[in-house]
């Protein structure tokens, strides 16, 4: 994992994400709703809801929006239902692409995802075609500007709690964990007084592909098109610096 900075990729696409902030809030609200519906409205007792709330806060979603989504899930009646679906395929230059969606209409979402791939230099694959190229990881970010950090002290906290790897840059520390150790590492860092800029479960590519400028521009269009879909919650690629 050394040399892979998810944070730098996130910052590189920040302007595009800022332009979609309203849509991001809508998608995260859906995740909060489903998590609260399945496991109850208390994030302290519902790990999936805690993850969704943390994701919302990382996106600067207002607390009122978060509370509204939880309250909606707690209301009487069946309410809404969404299926979790994963689509796999290849983008320009043979880059692997994973698409996670929450949908109330699988046919609609599958059609939209397929069109996005075919119109932007990609191809939708079969289940299992690229998933094996990614590892599920816990991912935590601590900004240097938020702390006077003694790196050895932080490293000790991370390793004792079960962290796997730390990537450092002038701006942030990026901490990776096995999925089963994510909660322990996150809680240990918070108890040690660290403010977490981001804390989530994510998919990390095992190998990064370098694209030329044309391929990168085409992949950016593909990712943008996928992220524009209301049902798509996350898009992961094996491209370097996207």
Swiss-Prot record:
Its main location: cytoplasm. It holds the Pfam family Transcrip_reg. GO terms for biological process: regulation of DNA-templated transcription. GO terms for cellular component: cytosol. One of its GO terms (molecular function) is DNA binding. Residues 1-22 are annotated as: Disordered. Residues 1-14 have a biased composition (Polar residues). The keyword Repeat does not apply. Belongs to the TACO1 family. This is Probable transcriptional regulatory protein EF_0663. It comes from Enterococcus faecalis (strain ATCC 700802 / V583).
